[in-house]
């Protein structure tokens, strides 16, 4: 996979001059990939649409609309200020030309309907201008029939439903069910089930609040519905466990159907492992077979058929293990990184520091076949040369025309199967701990790479000790963290939130 920098939205100023309200707090592609939504700490939602005027084999977006989703409020009963920050955005599938999405801050969820309306005005009449009186020289021959002509297009965003007063604690997750009729919302101690058409009633399906709050040992950190089976959902905890529940078993799903938990040697426990083991995000693969979980140090891939241990553990922040004291002092250890599955259901993506994000191709590798094959989900837009046991891009501008012709022959990015060789990224690795990683940077260096024609990404194999991410840097800038990202559902394009900027990288 060769990802190229495509475009960037937002002010390119220094990080010290950034307004807090402009920092992006969530980013999400819709189900088609034609629209992209971002939410920020100022309570605003900004929508981008695919630029259809560009050539077919490109991934560029343009501004569509912006609206204020949430405002700061004050809870007078608890004497608490409720921030306007957008925690999550989730798209609904639309049956017509309108767009629908859910947005939430710490307490209130809103269902928005975005429509593009055409404004028509009367273009001809029989009045004499400002006096609005019939013209004095009017005759039968000069009478004009009123005509409506298109004057302008107006994009309106209206809150159709407001789901409030159901959470006593901060909402960290919302997830739309595959039936497109219900969704769940999760806070620190409870998960509620909503019907999209009913705003004043929800059902509590998980409640881990103890009778005595002094006995509280864990909180809910993330929750998501299964992408195909509407009765299944999962939620993660600060103890590093993932629980899969079936709503058919009981109205209150406190008894989980499965629990995904890895045994850890008690002798290795310390003050920091209690914090770093907390799961910040969980995602189902698109086919519902696998789960990707992200904690501060690792990404873990779980098979739904195996609960006792993950099928792969990727050490993302191994280079920070000796610096956990520093991360604790500056609160970086509490950063909540997201994780995303690619459209091939095998590759995963997550963020790190220094404005870096990492893609792990074929992180899910079943190796069932004698001659393993991998789906070419990541088509190349340039020639490759073999170097150091894996493929690297050769920057040759003369090949661009040939590459465009090759791209047009492909009907579906996820259909072509390529035989895997020993050194190819899709082959079954001899060492289970080995994993290819692709590192990219979402900052000004992306502009320089695009201008110079150099490829912005670095590719390497990690073995045993995990990721080498950040080893080249003496200093880690903890202020430049990539927490929020989204993967295009049908293409090899990703959207990255870097403080107040939105970066688009694509293979197209």
Swiss-Prot record:
Ranges of the WD repeats in the UniProt entry: 19-58, 81-122, 166-204, 215-255, 274-312, 329-370, 477-507
InterPro entries: PP2A_PR55, PP2A_PR55_CS, WD40/YVTN_repeat-like_dom_sf, WD40_repeat_dom_sf, WD40_rpt
Pfam families: WD40
GO BP: negative regulation of G2/M transition of mitotic cell cycle; negative regulation of induction of conjugation with cellular fusion; negative regulation of septation initiation signaling
Region of interest (Disordered), ranges: 369-466
Record key words, sorted: Cell cycle, Repeat, WD repeat
Superkingdom of the organism of origin: Eukaryota
PROSITE patterns, alphabetized: PR55_1, PR55_2, WD_REPEATS_1
Start-end of Acidic residues biased regions: 396-418
Cellular component GO terms held in the UniProt record: mitotic spindle; mitotic spindle pole body; protein phosphatase type 2A complex
Gene Ontology molecular function terms on file: protein phosphatase regulator activity
Biased composition (Basic residues): 447-461
Keyword Secreted appears in the UniProt entry: no
UniProt KW Cell cycle keyword: yes
Family: Belongs to the phosphatase 2A regulatory subunit B family.
Assembly mode: PP2A exists in several trimeric forms, all of which consist of a core composed of a catalytic subunit associated with a 65 kDa (PR65) (Subunit A) and a 55 kDa (PR55) (Subunit B) regulatory subunit.
Function, as annotated: Phosphatase 2A affects a variety of biological processes in the cell such as transcription, cell cycle progression and cellular morphogenesis, and provides an initial identification of critical substrates for this phosphatase. The regulatory subunit may direct the catalytic subunit to distinct, albeit overlapping, subsets of substrates.
Designated name of the protein: Protein phosphatase PP2A regulatory subunit B
Organism of derivation: Candida tropicalis (Yeast)
Gene that encodes it: CDC55
């Amino acid at each position: 996979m060769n990802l190229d920098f495509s475009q960037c939205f937002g002010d390119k100023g220094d990080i010290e001059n950034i307004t807090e309200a402009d920092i992006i707090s969530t980013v999400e592609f819709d189900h088609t990939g034609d629209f992209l939504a971002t939410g920020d700490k100022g309570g605003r939602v900004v929508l981008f649409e695919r630029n259809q005027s560009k050539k077919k084999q490109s991934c560029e977006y343009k501004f569509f609309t912006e609206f204020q989703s949430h405002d700061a409020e004050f809870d007078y009963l608890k004497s608490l200020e409720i921030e306007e920050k957008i925690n999550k955005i989730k798209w609904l599938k639309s049956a017509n030309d309108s767009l629908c999405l859910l947005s939430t801050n710490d307490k209130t969820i809103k269902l928005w309907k975005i429509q593009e309306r055409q404004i028509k005005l009367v273009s001809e009449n029989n009045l004499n201008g400002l006096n609005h009186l019939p013209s004095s020289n009017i005759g039968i021959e000069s009478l004009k029939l009123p005509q409506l002509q298109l004057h302008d297009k107006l994009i309106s965003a209206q809150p159709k439903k407001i789901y409030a007063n159901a959470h006593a604690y901060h909402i960290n997750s919302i997830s739309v069910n595959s039936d497109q009729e219900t969704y769940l919302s999760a806070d620190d101690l409870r998960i509620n089930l909503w019907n999209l058409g009913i705003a004043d009633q929800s059902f509590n399906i998980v409640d881990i609040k103890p009778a005595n709050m002094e006995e509280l040992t864990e909180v809910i950190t993330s929750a998501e519905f299964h992408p195909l089976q509407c009765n299944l959902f999962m939620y993660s905890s600060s103890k590093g466990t993932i629980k899969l529940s079936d709503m058919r078993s009981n109205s209150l799903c406190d008894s989980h159907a499965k629990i995904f938990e890895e045994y850890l040697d008690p002798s290795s426990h310390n003050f920091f492992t209690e914090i770093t083991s907390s799961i910040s995000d969980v995602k189902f693969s698109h086919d519902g077979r696998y789960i990707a979980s992200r904690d501060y140090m690792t990404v873990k891939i779980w098979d739904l058929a195996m609960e006792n241990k993950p099928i792969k553990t990727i050490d993302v922040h191994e280079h920070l293990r000796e610096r956990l004291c520093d991360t604790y002092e500056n609160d970086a250890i509490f950063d909540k990184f997201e994780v995303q599955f690619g459209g091939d259901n095998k590759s995963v993506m997550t963020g790190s520091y220094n404005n870096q994000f990492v893609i792990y191709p074929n992180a899910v590798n079943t190796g069932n076949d004698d001659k393993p094959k991998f789906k070419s989900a990541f088509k190349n837009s340039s020639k490759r040369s073999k170097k150091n046991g894996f493929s690297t891009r050769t920057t040759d501008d003369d090949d661009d025309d040939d590459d465009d012709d090759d791209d047009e022959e492909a009907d579906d990015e996820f259909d072509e199967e390529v035989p895997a060789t020993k050194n190819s990224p899709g082959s079954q690795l001899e060492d289970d701990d080995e994993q290819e990683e692709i590192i990219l940077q979402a900052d000004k260096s992306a502009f320089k790479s695009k201008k110079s024609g150099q490829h912005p990404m670095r590719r390497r194999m990690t073995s045993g000790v995990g990721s080498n991410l950040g080893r080249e840097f003496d200093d880690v800038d903890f202020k430049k963290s990539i927490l929020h990202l989204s993967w295009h559902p049908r293409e090899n394009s990703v959207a990255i939130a870097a403080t107040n900027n939105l970066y688009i990288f694509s293979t197209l």
